[in-house]
């Protein structure tokens, strides 16, 4: 996993919520659904910010793509291309300036830095944390959900472990289990392997891939990454540059496209 780092990693970002609900902006909108068998879809999505001088700076420009249900997709592109902003909009943390968005619910955001999300003293308590809002759920059902979620990410035997004894990759898997315990349909994953060692990187990727395969269409994952070698685990990908979706489709096609761009760039430097 140390191989080809496609783009430089960005620093960690902190968001305040684990489970996120969509909101609606005055211009952009969140749709109930565009079509069947689609978990995520954007149409002509734009997002801009204003400077102190009142100048509008575009961050996302006319982005359109769709992700089928039950698949693992990745978003790749250079630093500053809009990957994380796009993920925040899909999560409902940021409203689009214009365009339309559909993300199947429930959806959950898993942070780049697990220490921003995994905060309870034990594994069991942390995975159960998000279930506290379901006041009609008894303790037996809570425990059953926690066990099933931990089994899905290969962490069942860690249920009583203190959080501080876990590695970074294990904490990421606990964060994913917390999302699964809430029966989420879409996982939004922000550069989960950026600060992990090789063993932890593989553990997290395998957990997500195994989860998607085991759920058989019930869970979809969208993973922001800067590592080209991670793309081989995906079903499809979105490649971005300068706030635009340049290509989207099956993982092999996007991988070939990126490698061709890299080769062309190297040839230009050498000429």
UniProtKB/Swiss-Prot annotation:
Which UniProt keywords are given for this protein, alphabetically ordered? ATP-binding, Nucleotide-binding, Transport
Domain ABC transporter, chain residue ranges per copy: 40-267
Q: Which GO terms are recorded in the biological process aspect for this UniProt protein?
A: chloroplast organization; transmembrane transport
Gene Ontology cellular-component terms for this entry are: chloroplast envelope; chloroplast inner membrane
Which superkingdom heads the taxonomic lineage of this protein's source? Eukaryota
| Family matches, as InterPro entries | AAA+_ATPase, ABC_transporter-like_ATP-bd, ABC_transporter-like_CS, ABC_transpr_CbiO/EcfA_su, Molybdenum_import_ModC, P-loop_NTPase
Please list the residues that bind ATP: 77-84
Q: Name one GO molecular function term.
A: ATP hydrolysis activity
User: Looking at the Swiss-Prot or TrEMBL record, what is one Pfam family this protein matches?
Assistant: ABC_tran
Q: Which family does it belong to?
A: Belongs to the ABC transporter superfamily. ABCI family.
Know the name of this protein?
A: ABC transporter I family member 10
Q: Which organism is it from?
A: Arabidopsis thaliana
């Amino acid at each position: 996993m140390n191989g080809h780092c496609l783009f430089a990693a960005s620093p960690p970002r902190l968001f305040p919520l684990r489970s996120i609900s969509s909101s609606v902006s005055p211009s952009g909108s969140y749709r109930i659904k565009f079509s069947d068998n689609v978990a995520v879809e954007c149409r002509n999505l734009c997002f801009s910010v204003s400077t102190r001088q009142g100048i509008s700076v575009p961050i996302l420009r006319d982005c359109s793509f769709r992700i089928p249900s039950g698949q693992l997709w990745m978003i790749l592109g250079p630093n500053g291309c809009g990957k994380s902003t796009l993920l925040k909009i899909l999560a409902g943390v940021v409203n689009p300036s214009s365009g339309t968005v559909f993300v199947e619910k429930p959806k959950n955001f898993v942070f780049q830095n697990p220490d921003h999300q995994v905060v309870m003293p034990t594994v069991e308590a942390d995975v159960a944390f998000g279930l506290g809002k379901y006041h009609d759920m008894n303790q037996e059902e809570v425990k059953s959900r926690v066990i099933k979620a931990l089994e899905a990410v290969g962490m069942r035997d860690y249920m009583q472990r203190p959080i501080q004894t876990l590695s970074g990759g294990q904490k990421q898997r606990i964060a994913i289990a917390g999302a699964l315990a809430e029966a989420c349909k879409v996982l939004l994953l922000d550069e989960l392997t950026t600060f992990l060692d090789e063993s932890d990187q593989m553990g997290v990727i395998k957990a997500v891939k195994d989860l998607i395969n085991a759920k058989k269409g019930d869970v979809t994952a969208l993973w922001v990454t800067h590592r080209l070698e991670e793309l081989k685990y995906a079903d499809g990908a979105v490649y971005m540059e300068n706030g635009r979706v340049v290509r989207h489709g099956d993982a092999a096609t996007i991988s070939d496209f990126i490698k061709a761009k890299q080769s062309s760039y190297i040839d230009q430097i050498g000429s």
